[in-house]
Amino acid sequence: MRLKEQIAILALGAGFAACTPKPPPHIIEDNMEFAQQQLRFAFDEIDYAIVNESPESREKREKNGWGELTNPRNSEPDGTLNLVPSKDWTSGFFPGELWYLYEYTQNNFWKKKAQQHTDMLEREKVNGTTHDMGFKMYCSFGNGYRLTQDEHYKEVLLQSARTLATRFKPKAGIIRSWDHSTARWACPVIIDNMMNLELLFWATKESQDSTFYRIAVDHAKTTMKHHFRPDFSSYHVVDYDTITGHVLKKNTHQGFADESAWSRGQAWALYGYTMCYRETRLPEFLEQAENIEKYLFTHRNMPEDLIPYWDFNAPDIPNEPRDVSAATVIASALYELSLYDAEKGQRYKDNADQIMDNLTKHYRATLKKDNGFLLLHSTGTKPTNTEVDVPIVYADYYFIEALMRKNKLEKTGKLF
């Protein structure tokens, strides 16, 4: 560990009680109790949605071989719960929430529920049509293995990593994202893909196969080279020629415009490079994460409550929808980033605490309503008016993860 990091950890541990603005006195306990009650209600909502699935939805699933409905994704504007099969990129977040509740409570009720909702996803370990293996498998099986050391979970994760590695394009140095939209892109890579690298780093340590490490580092370095503008904002989509490795175009899919800063994309980048630094200790990854953080928190359009609008360049700010999911990802990333810089660490944690305080006070769902989700006001894909200003499962997952990180950090001064 570098001296700078050791000083950062000591300074944080000593300074939390004296320097940190005090959030509500029991923000962790209050939110975790709320989460337990709300997710118990969510099980009833899930059962109801399965029983009342429309014939059209069932026929479409069966025709395409998508399998059974597994986990919640979002609330629709009319209040109905949208459940997804395992193939959906969001299918791993709900089981991940359950594993965190088991870790926090040590109550076997949550362990059994987590196992049930995790096991539904096993078929995805050989699904080579997607880059989202980290989201789906590491949030679910990864948390499960961390807490249980179940050898079967380990094998599922290793196979998932092997499957993800098949999407690596060595000439370009990237992991391909989507297979769709071939008329628009040859080999698209989205900034979200930084989040899937943690599975590869884990697989390196568990298998002693450095191939996974090299793929993850190559992808992170190539993304750092081509996805970012001089101000350290990120493009959403970069398209590559897999033969020459050259960049073909830079676009957006979920942001306001090609040259805008889609908020959740910036959050994925912050989290991804913070994690990459943890796994590699390469200083360029820490520098990248800190530059992204600086971009976010000095941006003129960052709201006072630190809950971003869906795009930092959206045309009708302050009347644009917020994206709570971006805020939860940022908060979770900041708790980790606070460990790695002695001078800025306290500020990073203070900002994370402010985000969590404001989410708790102003963005939380109503108990035993809102389909059992924890947070309101996330935005999925505004350009197509999909999942706009609704509860979305990944906002809840990173909210609980941030609470767990805050709890560990304040009790032990470390996270891992």
PLM region descriptions:
Residues K22-F416:
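Glycan-recognition and catalytic cores of secretory/periplasmic carbohydrate-active enzymes
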